[in-house]
Amino acid sequence: MAKFKRKYTLGEEIFNSVSHGIGAGLSIAGTVVLIVTAAIHTNAWGVVSSCIYGASLIILYTMSTLYHSFTNEKVKAFFRIMDHNTIFLLIAGTYTPITLYYLNGVTGWILFGIVWASAIFGIVMNSINLEKARIPSIFCYIGMGWVIVFAIKPLMEHMPSISGIFLIIGGIFYTVGIIFYAIKKVKYFHSIWHLFTVAGSVFHYFAILLGFFRI
């Protein structure tokens, strides 16, 4: 495992751990609401995909919180890899209800396969050499996040317009946030990235949740 070099001040790490700790708590509560709503208003695909999506939210925010909370060098290095890997997990997790419930059919399954295969590839890439994978990972995040544009027409036939709007806004928050994520040298930029991540997650969560109420 590569030696970890501390990059953030104590103040930054407190902000980073607290912000995503709150995100973890909200993810747990939100997942319960989502699954119950799916059980009432959707079918088996809605419930299963909600479980997968909710789990990806909880895991990402938990891993990020742990990474920014620990000070032990070896422990922090391990959770840094986990933190980066769960970004791929969340992207694929978010796509799961979109592809399996809203899109469904051939288009949904093809997109599901592409996104999850990309996520697995990214996780393996990060696990082998996180430093060398950092820049390629950023491009993978963006590519995976916006591949939905190729299926936007059939998606909007099965998703209410408000959900589509929230989906786009969430994607914009994530994408703009990557700018702050990529620039490591400026103090508190990573913390700003955390805020953009939470905002993106909130919009995507409600995009999926509100769509479940469509009759």
Where are these regions (language model features)?
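Multi-pass alpha-helical transmembrane bundles in non-GPCR membrane proteins
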Residues: 1-215
